[in-house]
């Protein structure tokens, strides 16, 4: 599933081609996504795009009368086309722009979403989200306060959007490795120093992935059709049985809440 770096990479890739241009029309080939494509999107015509923003894993296209909320789901990606290339099987939505560009949404598993809202504040998919991990609000003090009485393992807690948004399976595993923290540790067992370190490495790992265009493991592509290159720098995720890049101990893979977790028994305590 695309996580924060992949969504931010998509935002940065599409923004220059959309902001200041006008949506001439939307071409919806298959509106049966996780939720049906909103009727207002079908009716878009001569609508300028004012900004392209991100909240958590949602892309937000600001229009004069409302917002398009896009979620990439498990396998979605957005590409900017310079010409109307023939659509393939999983190309479900096109926004045809006045500058000759086309924003094409591809989603093999159709778990993504294209929603419309007049107001962002209070929308049900955004209302209960925690802070952005790259914001000043997310720091060691905040993390310690939220972990102090939490009797659950730290890995699934990091992936809870009520704690912090956008830290999915890949980046939770990578951040815990970078901080030297075992994923099965109770959140409440983390010290002040560990919370401070973990908050800092989460920011560092996410920023590094954004610099590399995100992580492509299967479906994700950047807006120019290229893969993200952070996969080449993964320390533990997807490396079951391979030697730890730090100590040489084989990487272990376990399941937490039906999600794969990767870690090093020697480096993470």
From Swiss-Prot:
Q: Name one GO biological process term.
A: base-excision repair
The protein's matches in InterPro entries, at most eight in alphabetical order, are given as: DNA_glyclase/AP_lyase_DNA-bd (IPR015886), DNA_glyclase_Znf_dom_DNA_BS (IPR015887), Formamido-pyr_DNA_Glyclase (IPR020629), FPG_cat (IPR012319), MutM-like_N-ter (IPR035937), Ribosomal_uS13-like_H2TH (IPR010979), Znf_DNA_glyclase/AP_lyase (IPR000214), Znf_FPG/IleRS (IPR010663)
Which residues make up the binding site for DNA?
90, 109, 150
Q: Where is the active site?
A: 2-3, 57, 259
- Coiled-coil region list: none
The cofactors it requires, by name, are:
Zn(2+)
Q: Which reaction does it catalyse?
A: Hydrolysis of DNA containing ring-opened 7-methylguanine residues, releasing 2,6-diamino-4-hydroxy-5-(N-methyl)formamidopyrimidine; 2'-deoxyribonucleotide-(2'-deoxyribose 5'-phosphate)-2'-deoxyribonucleotide-DNA = a 3'-end 2'-deoxyribonucleotide-(2,3-dehydro-2,3-deoxyribose 5'-phosphate)-DNA + a 5'-end 5'-phospho-2'-deoxyribonucleoside-DNA + H(+)
Task: Write down the CDD domains for this protein, in alphabetical order.
Answer: EcFpg-like_N
> Per the UniProt record, which EC number(s) apply here?
3.2.2.23, 4.2.99.18
Which GO terms of the molecular function aspect are on file? 8-oxo-7,8-dihydroguanine DNA N-glycosylase activity; class I DNA-(apurinic or apyrimidinic site) endonuclease activity; damaged DNA binding; zinc ion binding
Keyword Zinc attached:
yes
Free-text comment on the cofactor? Binds 1 zinc ion per subunit.
* Alphabetic keyword roster: DNA damage, DNA repair, DNA-binding, Glycosidase, Hydrolase, Lyase, Metal-binding, Multifunctional enzyme, Zinc, Zinc-finger
Zn finger residue spans: FPG-type: 235-269
Q: Name one Pfam family in it.
A: zf-FPG_IleRS
Instruction: Outline what the protein does.
Output: Involved in base excision repair of DNA damaged by oxidation or by mutagenic agents. Acts as a DNA glycosylase that recognizes and removes damaged bases. Has a preference for oxidized purines, such as 7,8-dihydro-8-oxoguanine (8-oxoG). Has AP (apurinic/apyrimidinic) lyase activity and introduces nicks in the DNA strand. Cleaves the DNA backbone by beta-delta elimination to generate a single-strand break at the site of the removed base with both 3'- and 5'-phosphates.
Q: Subunit composition?
A: Monomer.
Family assignment from sequence similarity = Belongs to the FPG family.
Q: What is this protein called?
A: Formamidopyrimidine-DNA glycosylase
């Amino acid at each position: 599933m695309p996580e924060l770096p992949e969504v931010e990479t998509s935002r940065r890739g599409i923004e220059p081609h959309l902001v200041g241009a006008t949506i001439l029309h939307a071409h919806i080939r298959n509106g049966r996504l996780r939720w049906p494509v909103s009727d207002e999107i079908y009716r878009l015509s001569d609508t300028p795009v004012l900004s392209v923003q991100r909240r958590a894993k949602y892309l937000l296209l600001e229009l004069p009368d409302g917002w398009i909320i896009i979620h990439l789901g498990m396998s979605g990606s957005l590409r900017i086309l310079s010409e109307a290339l023939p659509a393939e099987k999983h190309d479900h939505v096109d926004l045809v722009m006045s500058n000759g560009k086309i924003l094409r949404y591809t989603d093999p598993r159709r778990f993504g979403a294209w929603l419309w809202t007049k107001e962002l504040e209070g929308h049900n998919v955004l209302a209960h989200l925690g802070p952005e991990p790259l914001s000043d609000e997310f720091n060691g003090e905040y993390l310690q306060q939220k972990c102090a009485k939490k009797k659950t393992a730290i890995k699934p807690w990091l992936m809870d959007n009520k704690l912090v948004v956008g830290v999915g399976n890949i980046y939770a595993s990578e951040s815990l490795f970078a901080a030297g923290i075992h994923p099965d540790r109770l959140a409440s067992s983390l010290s002040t120093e560990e919370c401070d370190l973990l908050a800092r490495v989460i920011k560092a790992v996410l920023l590094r992935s954004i610099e590399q265009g995100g992580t492509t493991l299967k479906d994700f592509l950047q807006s120019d059709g290229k893969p993200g290159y952070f996969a080449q720098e993964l320390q533990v995720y997807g490396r079951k049985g391979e030697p730890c890049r730090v100590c040489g101990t084989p990487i272990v893979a376990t399941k937490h809440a039906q999600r794969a977790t990767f870690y090093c028994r020697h480096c993470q305590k």
